[in-house]
Amino acid sequence: MRFNSSIIVRRLTKVTTSNSAHEAPQFLSCRLPGKAFISVRGPDAVKFLNGLITAKLAPEVVKKSLTTVNPDVREVERHPSISGFDLRRGNWGIYKEGTRARGPYISRFGTYSAFLNSKGKVLTDTVVYPAPLGLPDGAAAKYPEYLLQCDAIFVEPLEHLLQRHKLLQRVKIARRDDLSVWHVAIDMDAYPEWEQSFSWRSEFWKPMVSLHNQDDALRFARWFIAQFFAGAEGRLVGAYYDTRNVDPTKKSNIFYMVTTGDVDDIATLFSPQMVSSKTTAVSVPYTEVRRARLRRGVLEGVSELRSEAVLPLEVNFDLYEDAVSFDKGCYVGQELTARTHATGVLRKRCAPVIVSNSASLDTLATSSRLDLYTDYVIPAASTSPSPTNSPFASQNPRPRKKQPIGKLLCVDGTDGVALVKLIYIERSRSCGSIECYVTHPETGERVPIYIDLQNRPIHLPE
C-alpha cells in the first residue's frame, strides 16, 4: 500500500460552520530541560544500534537461535510486507515492529527504547530519531543517521559506551549541542471545523503504521511538516509520537519535536494548513508536563529511572509501542529480558499513584526511594495455614516485620510513580483504590499514597 497524501489532505481540509461554543484550540509547548543528543551516522548505524538497544531496528536479522547471532548462518528474516532495500544505504528512516499496529512498518518518527547493562537493568532510556525528519532537498542522504536523546547528565557515559562498542563498525559518533527538544500537544479536536470529531488514531497513527517502504515514509513525514509546520522544514530535525500508556483506542496528541538550537519558541513554527480558526499558543511549565506524564505512570530519564536500578519490563517497556523486542536476537542485556518475558515471572511493575500531603515529601532528594507499605489485606492471601506447634518454639515469638509492597520511585506534587507488586496492581485494577503509605525518613510522618488503576489505568495492548 502506497501512501497517498491527497486522501488525508481532503479529510483534513473539511470545513463546517464555526461554532462559538467550542473552546479555543490550543498549541501547548514546553522546551524539555536537561536533554542532550548524540548523532550516530554511517552504513553500519542500524546494525550497531540494533545490538545495543531494546527496540528492534533491523527488519533483517541473521539468527542461529533466540539468544545468539552468527554471521555465518544466513537465515534471513524479513516481514513480507516490508519492501527490500539496503539498510546501509540512504537515510531511509527507522524500522518498527508494529507491536500495536498488527505488523511492521517504516517510519521517520522516532522510537522510545533503552540501553541495558549486562545484567539486563536499564542504564538509560532514549528516543531514537531518524534525522532529519523530512530530509530537506540537498540534505546529506548517503547513509542512515539517527539522534539519540538522553539526559544531559548521562550524555558523557552514553558517548563512552557507544565508542567502546564501536570497534570496526563503520559509524561516526558525535555529540550534538546545537539542538533542542520540545514537548508539544496539538489540540486538533478543539477546532470548530472538526466539530470535536478529530482522531489522532484515525488521521495520523493509522496512516503512519501502514507505510512499508522508505519513499512512503518520507512522503508522510513531509506531509506532516507541510500540514502542521509549513515553512519550517529546515528547522525540524526529528519527531517522536508519544503513545506511552495512553488509551489505545484514542491514541495521543503529544509529540516530542527536535529543532535547531536557534528556535526560541516552537509555537512560532506551528502553522496548521487544514483549518482557518485562530490557534492559541500556550507555553506550559515543565512541572505541568512532568506531572501529566507521571499521571500516566511513565518515568523518563536517569534521574527518575535511576541508572542500573530497574528492569525494562518493571517500568512497562513491554507495554509501550515497539520499545522492546523479544525476538531480534542478541543485544546487551537481552538474556534476562527475554527470559523474564518467556517465563512470565515478573513480580513488580510501575504504576501511577496519588500522593496525599505531598508537601511533606518536597524536601526529600529526588534520588530518595521510600519503601511502600499497606494495611490492606488481599483476601486470598489472608487465609494462610496456621504453623505447626513446635516444642522448641519460643514462648514469646517476635512479631513479623512488616514487609513493603513496593517502592515510591518518583513524586511531583500529588502525582507519583511507584514500583508495586503485581498482586496489588491487579487488585486495584479490579477493585479500585488501595491505600498505602510511606514513612518520612526524617520526621517519621506517615504519608498516605493511593493506587487507583481504575482512574489512572495501565493500558494493556488491544
From Swiss-Prot:
Residues 382-394 have a biased composition (Low complexity). Residues 1-11 form a transit peptide. InterPro entries: TrmE/GcvT_dom1, YgfZ/GcvT, YgfZ/GcvT_CS. The gene is CAF17. This is Iron-sulfur cluster assembly factor IBA57 homolog, mitochondrial. NCBIfam families: ygfZ_signature. GO terms for molecular function: transferase activity. Its main location: mitochondrion. Keywords: Mitochondrion, Transit peptide. The keyword Cell cycle does not apply. One of its GO terms (cellular component) is mitochondrial matrix. It is found in: Mitochondrion matrix. Residues 382-405 are annotated as: Disordered. SUPFAM superfamilies: Folate-binding domain. Belongs to the GcvT family. CAF17/IBA57 subfamily.
